[in-house]
Amino acid sequence: MQLFPAIDLRGGQVVRLTQGDYDRMTVYGQDPCAQARSFVAAGAKNLHVVDLDGAKDGTLSNYDTIAALAKQGGLYIEVGGGIRTEERIEKYLSLGVGRCILGSVAVTDFAFTARMLQKYGDKIAVGVDAKDGYVAIHGWKEVSAEPGVAFCKRLAEAGCTAIIYTDIACDGTMQGTNLSLYRQLAAQVPGVAFTASGGISSEAELLELQQMGTAAAILGKSLYTGALDLARCVQLVQD
């Protein structure tokens, strides 16, 4: 199982939100590149980057920071937040970003998403955020009428091979992740590599996710608060 330590960017700073709430934001650092280097030093090979400003208002205000992160070397980087056009996808891929994550646009413009999946293949992942089992969009402010699992099946039929699935109730809470949900996704949507995201806060959870065949896990607040040690986690999933 791959591990993706997370860097969420707001105004060029490293931050974490609780349950996607911009009013419940904690700043953890002023230097995202230094943070990335510390992840590499702990053995990380991947990095999950979210442009929170882009997600909120579609701006590119963190573009230079993401460009600098992409130049770090030794890291496979996935980027999400405000990616709603092919031009933006091209812009990030040209930096050397490994894959772009489509979020709300996958719900609001499924035809566009299907086209991008066909054109760019594994350079595109889809981020599915679910609230009480239903897909949420636009910074989790709106909840659609479509169940998350059904939406994942539709994405798979459109050629999607990688889905980052977040249970909003768990995200940033440090209360543990929704293990039964990932078990259900693995059983009902075969052929898709799922990344677990939201609330992972123990080594036991990582091992359970790995045993059920989860492709990757995103670690955020658990690393910043010291609840999990990244070097130990990397060893754990490699052994």
Where are these regions (language model features)?
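Charged helix-capping and loop-helix junction motifs
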Residues: L60-A67, K141-A150, Q175-Q184
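Conserved beta-strand positions in the central sheet of alpha/beta enzyme cores
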Residues: H48-D51, E78, I101-L102, A125, ...
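Glycine/small-residue-rich loop that forms an oxyanion/phosphate-binding "nest" at active or ligand-binding sites
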Residues: D53, G58-Q118
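Catalytic cores of alpha/beta
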Residues: G73, I77-R99, S180-A216
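Conserved, mostly hydrophobic/aromatic
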Residues: D8, F39, L47, Y92, ...
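Conserved anion-binding
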Residues: G11, Q19-D23, E90, V97-D171
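Glycine-rich, proline-tolerant flexible connector loops at the mouths of alpha/beta enzymes
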Residues: N46-D64, S104, Y165-Q175
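Glycine-rich phosphate-binding active-site loops on the catalytic face of alpha/beta enzymes
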Residues: I83, S94-F112, D167-C170, G198-S202, ...
